[in-house]
Amino acid sequence: MDITHASDQKINSENFAKLALDCVHKEYPNKISHTMQSDKDVMPPRELTPAFYGCYDWHSSVHGHWLLTRLAKLYPDSELAPKAIAALEISLSEENLQQESVYVSGKGRKAFERPYGIAWLLQLAAELDDWDEPLAKEWRENIRPLEEILFSRVVEWLPKLTYPVRSGQHAQTAFALGLMLDWARTANNREVESLIRNRILEFYSDDKKCPIHYEPSGADFLSPCLAEADLMRRVMSPSEFAVWLNDFLDVPNSNTTWLEPAIVSDRSDPKLAHIDGLNLSRAWMLEGIASGLPPKDLRIKALSAAAAEHQESGLIGVNSEFYEGGHWLGSFAIYLVTKRGVLIQKIK
């Protein structure tokens, strides 16, 4: 199936939405990242974080809500839209989000879900920003206090981050900064945008010869090399980015197979299933890199061909057979097929 075709994409998107609808209010199984100070802090997930307690963990719940928001906004006449809106109405109440703010402000939680979960929360806020659904305006205001707490932590943390984290999992700096930068631009927060942009250039502008042949590690769901390149195209003009990429990544000037999709050996294993997410994120990062180059750059063909291969491989694993992947892969699929990262306007 060619998911780039509009009708096929809508069908696939509805299937992915079902994965999120099935888990945003499913409390168990659950893996909480919970710092406790005493016995009184022992509570079930629905009481600790009543907006984002489903989908196995907090960050997956957040981007599950992002998925529902994005699809209901893109396909308002679809069968999934009213179901998505109903789920969002339950989760994004003022009371629930007030408790989320109380929770993240608790003692010992200064680094809660930093940077990955924070980045997705900011994406959810950005997705609500320009939605003409009447309830969305209410939800946008409900989530604003939590948003302000979390982006203020980014503002405090980034200047202290001496070195970027170059892993292929949640702690990776490059991927999170890309989502955060996109949020800052959508929110028209010039101060935070400038901070993030400057740190990106300080961290990565001198990097050369990224060893992509060392990738992936066994539980990666993000590519360190591709995430960095996809980030840099957001802060450089096409001509600047083309020169930087020359030194950073060896991409052929022809439509040849140069980066093969990673192999998933066991989708019932929560860590090994990360590889499906890697293929999906590689696909959107390759597309993003191609979009940042001058239109006649000869590397675009190879980047686009590799993106298509990774998309095809990654989408195979996006289903409800195993909750290990089903609770989160739908969000990655939607980020890819709806071109979310590519569509954000970048500074030229």
Language model segments and positions:
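Extended ligand-binding groove/face enriched in aromatic
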Residues: V62, L71-A184
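Flexible internal linker/loop segments at domain or repeat junctions
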Residues: V243-P270
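Well-ordered alpha-helical scaffold segments within catalytic/enzyme domains
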Residues: D2-A6, H65-S78, A119-L135, A176-N188, ...
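Loop-centered beta-sheet repeat module
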Residues: R153-E228
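Solvent-exposed loop and edge beta-strand segments that line ligand/cofactor-binding
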Residues: H5-Q9, R46-V62, V102-I118, K160-T173, ...
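Extended, well-ordered alpha-helical scaffold segments
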Residues: Q9-L19, S78-E95, P134-W157, N189-D207, ...
